[in-house]
Amino acid sequence: MMKAAGLNLEIFSGGGTGTYDIMTGVPGFTDVQVGSYLFMDCQYIEIGGAQNETVFDDFAPSLTVMTTIVNNNYPGRLVTDSGSKALTLNQPTAFVIGEPDFKYNAGSDEYGSITFEKSSKSYKVGDKLEVIVPHCDPVVNLYDFMYAIRKEKVESVLPILARGKSQ
């Protein structure tokens, strides 16, 4: 149909990170438009994949945000300094690394709330938690810089040149 319409089919491009392994089976397909695979996020983790219907684990998450506990006064609840302005309101919510039972809610602009029934340790005000972001695209747009870290050492500071450039 596309050939009959006179379209150039040298490049037949589409799909994305979540469908990269499906699109390659489409006849004539030449190019997959993956981009988020670089970072991954909670949305991709939860969609499932061709190899694992429960979780998309073809690529590991690399984009995280460090948040600080600012209140621990209530049993089963922590308050952090990362709300919707740091993590967006996208679903699913952020995943706390090392704490699979934590439920993160970034519903407030400036603060996040974590509820849990069990945790791996006792947390105090000032403790840091690393969270996997809900949706990488809008989260990157919220920051001026990205820190490239390897083995707990900052190797590079990268400016986000397109930050806030939505039109």
Segments from the language model and where they lie:
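Active-site anion/phosphate-binding pocket segments in diverse small-molecule metabolic enzymes
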Residues: 1-167
